[in-house]
Regions:
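Short, small/polar-rich loop/turn modules that mediate ligand/substrate recognition or access, typified
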Residues: 171, 176, 242-244
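Short C-terminal tail/terminal secondary-structure segment
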Residues: 144, 232, 243-258
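Alpha-helical segment proximal to the catalytic Tyr-Lys
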Residues: 124, 168-169, 240
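Conserved glycine-rich cofactor-binding loop
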Residues: 14-18
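Substrate-binding pocket helix/loop in short-chain dehydrogenase/reductase
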Residues: 95-97, 103-108, 212
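Catalytic loop of short-chain dehydrogenase/reductase
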Residues: 135-159, 163-172, 184-185
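A short, exposed helix-loop element centered on a Lys and neighboring polar residues
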Residues: 119-120, 164
Length: 258
């Protein structure tokens, strides 16, 4: 299927690895020019080189997008994107009793205020041009809270609520805003949390990994490639009637019908 977005321009945040990289790869395969950002120059430039093999224009921007200066640098590199993929690593796990006001501020800054600032900077240009696709990568915690991830639960749910009305307004101009709610995907973050769980229990990493996979009805973790394919479709010309939705991709893990 031709997604109809060849020649479009996209910003993909946190795209040097993991789910962000999967999204950038999927868009590049469809002929989309991509501006990618991350804080680590080495990994970002390596990803940019890989993406360039698709024949599209790839612009890497080394920055901390959670800062105003970082967002300014990113938007200077691509001031008029047709596609915006908001993505950020989640806040650290912990216990509610131990979280400080500063912990909450950082969580909200990184996972709510930053994507909202990028949306505010780009959505109105998209509306004027008559095409835009915004995808917020959040978390399965939007559907069901995840223990020990209260910081992420709160900040990501805040973002989801904040864009709900805008999604209904922007769609009249062929601009959609949707959320993708990933469950367990084979990423550095998941491997890191699995390692910590194994260390805390003093068991082998393979034991915890097997337990986590067994808890997923699909019997495995998701891949960044299949995640990116879903995001690319939501960015396509065929998805203009899908907006304000939050799509859970978790291998069947959510135990509800709705």
């Amino acid at each position: 299927m031709d997604l109809g977005i060849r020649g479009k321009k996209a910003i993909v945040c946190a795209a040097s690895k993991g789910l962000g990289k999967g999204c950038a790869e999927a868009l590049a395969r469809e002929g989309v020019d991509v501006t990618i950002c991350a804080r680590g120059a080495e990994a970002l430039n390596a990803t940019a080189k890989e993406l360039g093999a698709s024949g599209v224009k790839v612009t890497p921007v080394v920055c901390d997008v959670t800062t105003e200066a970082g967002r300014k640098a990113l938007l200077a590199a691509c001031p008029d994107p047709d596609i915006l993929i908001n993505n950020a690593g989640g806040p650290p796990p912990g216990d509610f009793k131990d979280f400080s006001s500063e912990d909450w501020r950082k969580a909200v800054e990184g996972n709510m205020i930053t994507p909202l600032a990028l949306i505010h900077a780009t959505v109105y240009g998209m509306m004027q041009r008559g095409f835009g696709r915004i995808v917020n990568i959040t978390s399965a915690s939007i559907k069901h809270p995840i223990a020990a991830l209260e910081l992420s639960n709160g900040a990501r749910l805040g973002l989801t609520g904040a864009v709900a009305v805008l999604a209904r307004k922007a769609c009249k101009s062929n601009v959609t805003i949707n959320g993708i709610l990933p469950g367990p995907f084979d990423t550095d973050r998941l491997r890191g949390t699995t390692q910590k769980m194994a260390e805390a229990r003093k068991v082998a990493l393979s034991v915890v990994e097997a337990e986590r996979k067994a808890a997923v009805p699909a019997g495995r973790f998701g891949s960044a490639e299949e995640f990116g394919a879903v995001v690319a479709f939501l960015c396509s010309t065929h998805a203009g009637y899908i907006t304000g939705q939050n799509l859970l991709i978790d291998g069947g893990g959510y135990p509800g019908s709705l």
